Each structure stands twice: as C-alpha cells, then as structure tokens.
Swiss-Prot record:
Binding-site positions, Mn(2+) 1: 345, 349, 420
Protein name: Cyclic-di-AMP phosphodiesterase GdpP
Predominant subcellular localization, coarse grouping: membrane
InterPro entries: DDH_dom, DHH_sf, DHHA1_dom, GdpP-like_PAS, GdpP/PdeA, GGDEF_dom, Oligoribo/pAp-PDE_c-di-AMP_PDE
GGDEF domain location: 173-301
Cofactor(s) required, per the database record: heme b; Mg(2+); Mn(2+)
Record note on domains: Has a GGDEF domain (residues 173-310) preceded by a PAS-like domain (residues 84-149) which together have ATPase activity, followed by a region with a DHH (339-496) and a DHHA1 (591-646) domain. The combined GGDEF, DHH and DHHA1 domains have c-di-AMP phosphodiesterase activity (residues 150-659) that is 10-fold enhanced by inclusion of the PAS-like domain (84-149); PDE activity may only require the DHH/DHHA1 domains. The PAS-like domain is important for heme b-binding.
Cofactor details (free text): Binds 1 heme (probably heme b) per subunit, probably hexa-coordinated, which inhibits PDE and ATPase. The Fe(2+) binds CN(-), CO and NO. ATPase activity (residues 84-303) prefers Mg(2+) over Mn(2+).
Length: 659
C-alpha cells in the first residue's frame, strides 16, 4: 500500500472501501460468478492505478524537494557571499579562519584570512573575553553591531551606521524649552527714571536677541523679567560647550552703579512631550533660583541635573515682608499640628543646633510640644561644649530626644521641621522623613537636585549667612508671649558666628540685625567664644596638616598629608585647617584633604567669594555654600582624592563644573 495510505486519516476509509468491495464481490459470485469475476478485475485495475498515482506523486514531491534544496543551498551561499552582513570565523588564538566578501570589503581588503583580530578589529576582542552577547563598535569609521557566538567562534557584523545617524539626527532635532529669568530686575531698576530703565531693557533685550540669533534660537519676552526660548538638542550641546557665555555677557554689560543684572535659566530637555518639557524647564528654573541665581540648570527626565555658572556671590534679595509671611505661615502650620519634631543634619554643627532650638521656641510660643532629634553617637567635638552647657538647663535638655524616641512619638498629625539641610540623605534620621507627612524645610544652602519630598513650607534663602539667622527673623514675628532665655539666644548667636567666621564671610545687614536681636535677648558672646575654643592637641594636629600645604594655580591652597604619613583627622579639624589656610596672603580658596577613617577621605573647601567652592565640591558628590563646602569620598586613597580635586578645579576654571 502507498506510504501515505498508511496514515490513519487515509487508511481506515480505504480499508472500509476494500472490505465493502470484497463483500460486494462475494455476493456477486454467489448470485453470478461472471459478474463477480468482472468486479475482481475492476478492483485489481483500480488498485493498480492507485499504486501508480502514488508513485507519480512521490516522484513529483522528491523532484520538488530536490529543487527546493538546491535553491535553499544557492540562497545560503549567496547570503554568505553577497548579503550586506559580515560573517567571520576565528580560532582560539583570535586569528581569522574565514570571512565573507562583504566584511573584507568593509576593511578595504581582498581577504582577511590569516589576519589577527587584534590587527583588524581590536575593540571586539575584549567583548569576546568579557562574554558580551552583542555590542556596537566602530570599525573603519563605520558602526557595526557585533553578535558573538562563542561556541562556534563566529562573529556577525551588522552595519548600523545609517541607523545610528538617523537616531543622532532625531536626538539633535528634539525640542528643548528654556525659561529665562532676570534675577534682580526689580532691585536694579527700582529708583531708575523711565529713560534709564528703558535703556537697560533695550540693552538686555539686544544682548539676548543677538545671542538667540547666533545660535538659531526662538526667543520671546513674556514679561519685563521673563523670556521663553525654544531650541533643539544640537543647539543645547553648542550652548553647553560655550558654558552658556551669555551669563557672563549680560552680567558684564548691564552693570549700573556697581550692580549688574544676572540671568537664571531653566532648561527642559530629552523628552518628546511638550507638557513634560515645560514642567522640567520650570523645575530647573526653580532650582537655579534656589541656588542663588546667575546660573543655568538643565534637568533631565532621569532626575539628573547639570549646572553652569553660579560663580558669583548672590545678592541679598529676601525682605522682611517675606520673613513675616513665612513666620505667620509657620505659626498656622504649627497650630494645626499635634506636636513638632525638629531635626538637623548628621553630625550637627552650631548652626544646626541653634536653628533647631529656635524652632523649638516657635512651637512653645504656640503652645505645642516640641522636640529636637539628636543622635548621641553623632555629636562632634565642635558642639560638645554647647551640648554640655545645654545639659545645665533641664527644661531645655529634656526637649532633646533620640531618633528612636522620635519615631515612637510621631503620629499622623506630627509636624517635622528640617533645618540647615534640604537633602533626605543628610538628615539626622531619614526614617522620620519617610514616616511623617507634614514637613517644613528651613535652610540657607543652595538648593541641590536632591530634595525633601512634598514639603508644606519651604524657606530657603542662599543669601542668608546661616539658618540661625533665618530662624531668628522668624522668631521676631511670633506671638509676644515668646520668651528666649540666655542659653537659647547664645546657641542661635553661636550658629551665626560660626557660619560667618565671626562676621567676616557672607555677612549682610540682616545678619547684624539678627545678632543685635539675640544680644538684646541676653546672648552671651563670651560663652560663644568658649564654645569655639580648641585643645592644644587639636591645634598641633591641625598645624601638621597645614604644614604640607601646596599652592595650586598660584592662589589655591591645598593641604594634605603624604601617603606615608597615614593619620586620621576629625571632620571639624579638617574644616579648621581649610579656614586657617584662607587667612594666608594671596590665597583665594583653600582645600584641606585628609582621611577621616579607613574608608573615608574628607575634603573641606573655603573661599573668599571669588571662587565658588560649592560647584567644585558638587563635582565630587558634595555640596555646601559659595564660600564654604565639603565632600566625603569613599574607597579611595588621599592621593586619588587629590587628583580628583585638581581635575574638578581645572574644570571649574575652564568654564564650569557640571553634575
């Protein structure tokens, strides 16, 4: 029987037909043997033709398969030899055993057989060793996606040059939105006559229009102090390469009576949604203004932010009206809360503790229980004397609690006030930030990309000398029943004195007003000086660090111990060394680099204002203020930290350090 008849689908019906035919023949033989004989002959003929048809079908199928196999073999050969896909076989020593003509033509060679991968495509060898499955590499000015089959020692090369060019073109042409804000327009133009104000407006508009025309930017003025700019990613790259020189140009050419206009620019990029672009641009502008203005902030969808500019000391812009409004808003929030928990940053300083005590008085003035969170394991030598003095006042010391106690007493109506920092990673106890919903942030540092989530109230003034100064102003507008005793006023004054280096840095008229208010409340300046005293041992140790100071770029002092003199330094001691260096002649900025423990290298940075050390420290994952900043680096040596520091300084002077 033909082979396909053996399949059940065909076999059973045929068996049934044959059985039926045999029965029919038998019946015919019974009645008429001649008819039976004829039927037998007919059945034999039918079976013969079925067999013959099966044979013909099998021959046709075999012929078709043979033709198809030949065609497939031909296609395979042509694919190997003619298709624009590179194929390469190599041996254990990374020598090429075979390569198709397309791949040879990519290297402008007639054949690659016998050549080493190190000579022809060296960048592929590390991928093979690293067990990478697929990667894009550059060979002879073209881009290839290499697929690696290690078991067969086979490489496929897909030319993706045009695809990458199209992707690059798409990226370059994506829309970018920028909001431009004249930081101090009202301050500069107030008091000017109409003609002078009009001249200044024309000058600013002319500068910005010329800048926009040079780079092909659409620019529209939306108000006296606001502009909107539309550009693309390619233009943004050019602006980044120029370090946004328009900032310096506007500042230099709009000076009036020693006061110049400055720009803040918020840029939204790398998304296709216009709404998201607008949100990113506004968020970037808020960030630039929160950091003191005179700078550009570029915020990307992944949360990363790049900064340009911000090298000048920001002008004092806050007013007593704003302080009064914030104070009243804080009073309302405190009144609606069940209790108040105040928290500063890790390893608190005088400013952090002084400001926390000030907010404690705000809570008490509004008849609410207030508590200050402090970790006994994080009390540094710089505040030990202050804490020791506070312990003499039981009523005040009883308000200090540990992070664990704070977690226990917090509830849904608790208010958390964070002072002297705005970064969740730096607070005394991050669990409180995650647990408590109602949060207020009071800080004087420039705003960074990391920020407390959804605060009810934010009072950030980078123009202030210290957080203690901001809190002192808030105290002045609290209910009259507020009473501040000597130790509380002294703690606030100590915070101001430490952050201003005894009123020598970042000191404005409002700083002296706050100090005067605290002195009137009984602040003891002699006690403050006792807080600031140091031991002979710490003085000698600090001198040892300063002894190995070198000058970099003529006016930058860098102090660090040689690698062969491994020694651990307290963070406060490192900061004091940087302060001491700043008092040297011809030193504009100082950096003290030392190991705090086995894993951590600390860098403290100080400046007189000409050099923005905050930007330099941000490049090293740190932060701070224009004249006072620091960072901590883990897992590196002091010499490696010095190299990274010098690289950040070089980038700063070349036109702006970015993150």
């Amino acid at each position: 029987m033909p082979s396909f008849y053996e399949k059940p689908l065909f076999r059973y019906p045929i068996y049934a037909l044959i059985a039926l035919s045999i029965i029919t023949i038998l019946i015919s033989f019974y009645f008429n043997w001649i008819l039976g004989t004829v039927e037998v002959l007919l059945l034999a003929v039918i079976l013969f033709f079925i067999k013959r048809a099966d044979s013909l079908i099998r021959q046709e199928i075999d012929a078709y398969i043979s033709t198809l196999s030949y065609r497939l073999k031909k296609v395979g050969e042509e694919a190997l030899m003619e298709m624009p896909i590179g194929i390469m076989l190599f041996n254990d020593q990374y020598y090429i055993e075979w390569a198709n003509p397309f791949l040879s033509s990519c290297f402008n060679e007639s054949t690659l057989v016998g050549r080493s991968l190190y000579d022809t495509c060296e960048s592929v060898v590390p991928l093979i060793k690293q067990e990478v499955e697929s990667e894009t590499v550059t060979l002879n000015d073209r881009k290839f996606r290499v697929v690696i089959k290690r078991d067969e020692r086979l490489l496929y090369f897909f030319d993706v040059t045009e695809q990458i060019q199209i992707e690059k073109l798409y990226e370059n042409e994506r829309t970018v939105l920028a909001y431009i804000f004249l930081d101090n327009y009202d301050d500069v133009t107030q008091g000017l006559d109409d003609q002078t104000r009009s001249t200044m407006n024309s000058q600013v508009t002319s500068l910005l229009n010329a800048w926009a025309q040079e780079y092909g930017i659409f620019l529209k003025r939306t108000s006296s102090e606001r502009f909107i700019a539309v550009l693309n990613e390619h233009i943004l790259t050019e602006l980044e390469n120029s370090k946004f020189s328009i900032l310096d140009e506007v500042r230099e050419k709009t000076s009036f009576d020693g006061v110049a206009l400055t720009l803040s620019v918020g840029v939204g990029a790398s998304v296709s949604s216009l709404k998201e672009l607008g949100d990113l641009a506004q968020s970037s502008l808020d960030l630039a203004l929160g950091r003191g203005g005179d700078q550009v902030a570029i915020k990307l969808p992944n949360g990363k932010v790049k900064f340009y500019g911000g090298k000048t000391n920001p002008m004092e812009k806050r007013t007593r009206v704003r302080a009064r409004v914030i104070s009243h808003a804080l009073k309302e929030i405190v009144t609606e809360s069940s209790n108040v928990i105040i928290m500063g940053h890790k390893f608190p300083d005088m400013d952090s503790i002084g400001a926390a005590i000030g907010i404690l008085k705000v809570a008490q003035a509004n008849n609410k229980d207030g508590f200050i969170v402090i970790d006994p394991n994080q009390i540094g030598s710089s505040v030990q004397r202050l804490i020791g003095e506070i312990k003499k006042y039981e009523e005040l010391w009883s308000r200090f609690i540990t992070p664990e106690e704070a977690m226990e007493i917090s509830n849904d109506d608790t208010l958390l006030v964070i002072v002297d920092t705005h970064k969740p990673s730096l607070v005394m106890e991050e669990r409180l930030v995650n647990k408590i919903e109602h949060i207020v942030v009071i800080d004087h540092h420039r705003r960074g990309e990391e920020f407390i989530r959804d605060p009810l109230l934010v009072y950030m003034e980078p123009y202030a000398s210290s957080t203690a100064e901001l809190v002192t102003e808030l105290l002045e507008y609290q209910p009259k029943r507020l009473k501040i005793n000597m130790i509380e006023a002294t703690a606030l004054l100590a915070g101001i004195i430490v952050d201003t280096k005894s009123f020598s840095l970042r000191t404005g008229s409002r700083t002296f007003d706050a100090a005067s208010y605290l002195r009137a409340k009984g602040a003891d300046t002699v006690l403050v000086q006792k807080f600031l005293k140091e031991t002979v041992d710490s003085y000698i140790k600090r001198a040892k660090l300063i002894q190995h100071t070198v000058l970099y770029k003529d006016n930058i002092a860098i102090a660090s111990l040689p690698e062969n003199e491994e020694e651990y330094f307290d963070q406060v001691l490192i900061a004091q060394a940087a302060d001491s260096l700043l008092s040297m002649s011809e030193v504009e900025a100082s950096f003290a680099v030392a190991r705090r423990d086995e894993q951590t290298v600390c860098i403290s940075a100080r400046s007189l204002g000409e050099v923005n050390v905050q930007i330099i420290m941000e490049a090293l994952e740190g932060g701070g203020h224009l004249t006072n900043a620091a960072t901590q680096l883990s897992g590196i040596s002091v010499s490696e930290a010095l190299e990274r520091l010098k690289h950040a300084i070089d980038e700063y002077f070349e036109g702006g350090v970015q993150r």
